[in-house]
């Protein structure tokens, strides 16, 4: 089971239980540098993700990343430096989701432009090619639909828990 999480509840007792179960992988939400990440996810979130990565790596638990890219963080979260940091922490795969302005704090100005979406398609294809020496396999939730038979949401293979605790078929 792949569980997408902000990682704030991952601690040692939790990791021990996950190891005992043996069938859970995690996708950790991260959106760039400490300041960029915490501005969107809340103070201390970046440090919580870094700590969770250390624990998951220590316990040998499979994990990747869930990265929301915006018009403001797109180049930072696809930079060689960022990708290498993720690999050093133990993540070698992840999903990129482009920002969708939904909810009470929607910010349409954070939506990637068409040119930025094209950059993502090209950058992800490059990172997956043999030209790249970064051992990280990125997937683009929206732009890789052809490889997974279309959107995986909508009652097929995905649902999320919203901030009110309700299960929904899509974001």
Provide a role label for each language-model segment.
Residues 65, 89-93, 105-132, 160-163:
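C-terminal scaffold of the Radical SAM
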Residues 34, 105, 157:
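Gly/Ser/Thr-rich beta-alpha loop segments that engage phosphate groups in nucleotides
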Residues 14, 103, 155:
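Solvent-exposed, flexible loop/coil residues
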Residues 72-74, 93-114, 137-150:
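Flexible glycine/acidic-rich beta-alpha junction loops that bind and position SAM and/or redox cofactors
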Residues 1-98:
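Radical SAM/AdoMet-radical enzyme domain recognition
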């Amino acid at each position: 089971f792949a569980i997408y999480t902000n990682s704030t509840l991952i601690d040692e007792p939790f990791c021990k239980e996950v190891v005992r179960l043996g069938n859970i992988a995690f996708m950790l939400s991260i959106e760039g540098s400490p300041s960029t990440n915490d501005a969107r996810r809340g103070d201390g979130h970046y440090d919580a993700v870094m700590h969770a990565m250390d624990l998951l790596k220590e316990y040998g638990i499979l994990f990747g990343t869930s990265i929301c890219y915006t018009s403001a963080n797109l180049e930072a979260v696809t930079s060689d430096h960022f990708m290498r940091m993720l690999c050093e922490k133990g993540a070698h795969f992840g999903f990129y989701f482009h920002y969708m302005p939904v909810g009470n704090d929607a910010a349409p100005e954070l939506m990637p432009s068409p040119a930025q979406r094209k950059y993502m398609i090209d950058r992800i294809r490059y990172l997956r090619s043999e030209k790249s020496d970064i051992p990280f396999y990125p997937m683009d939730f929206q732009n890789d639909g052809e490889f997974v038979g279309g959107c995986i949401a909508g009652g097929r293979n995905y649902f999320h828990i919203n901030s009110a605790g309700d299960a929904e078929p899509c974001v």
